[in-house]
Every structure is written in structure tokens, then in C-alpha cells.
């Protein structure tokens, strides 16, 4: 049996993950379709130029950050994942809360149990300078 990590090791790993996310400019998100709740990591807030945890994100508000010409594509990817369990990997323009246009790579992966999507999780990466 593997030993469990100490609280200090867990705290160190969490801090390292936060630092790596900031360095790579990549954030994570998770959506619970049953509760209709969306969670963003600190870095997603930073990518969209909001103070971390200053707003409670929703799917609708998240899609609203994409450039107008990209919103239908993002909404379709979400709907297809929720209804058919299909993952996506897209590069789309996004308009931050401060009005700056950037490009992001957004990846979504559904968790399907008994043919039903019970959770979506993924990443948002600012690829503007890449």
C-alpha cells in the first residue's frame, strides 16, 4: 500500500500547480451539469482579466467572453459534449473583461457514466503570444 502524502506535501504540490498554471498561462475549469455549477481556477480568472473569485461564472457568461463570431462554435462544443459525450479542442478568439482581444485554446473532456454526461472538465490556455 502506498503511503499517503503529508499535509505539507499536499500544500507544496498545490502551490507548485498554481505557479505552473501562472507560468504556462493555462487555467482549469469544471462544470457539473446536474447542479448547473461552473468552477474556474484562479488562472482562468486571470486570463479573462478578472480578479480571482470576484464573480461566479456560469456557462452562459463564459460563452459570452468569446468573440461574437466564436460564441456559436463554443456553445455547439458544449452542447455536443453534454448531449453526446464528445470532447473538443479548439482555438478561438476571446474578449477579456477589459476589452482586450486574445486567442485561447480551450479543451473540454466529458465524464460519461451510463451514457450520460455527469461532468465536464478542461483547460483554457492563452495562446496569443505563442
What residues fall within each predicted segment?
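PAS-associated C-terminal cap
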Residues: 1-16, 125-130
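Sensory modules in modular signal-transduction proteins
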Residues: 11-29
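PAS/PAS-like sensory domains
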Residues: 21-27, 72, 80-90
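PAS and PAS-like sensory/regulatory domains
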Residues: 26, 88-90, 97, 102-106, ...
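Short acidic/glycine-rich beta-turn/loop cap or linker motifs at sensory/regulatory domain boundaries
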Residues: 29-39
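PAS-family sensory domains
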Residues: 31, 81, 93-99, 111-113
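PAS and related sensory helical modules
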Residues: 37-64, 71-76
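Short loop/turn elements at sensory-signaling interfaces that couple input to output
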Residues: 106-122
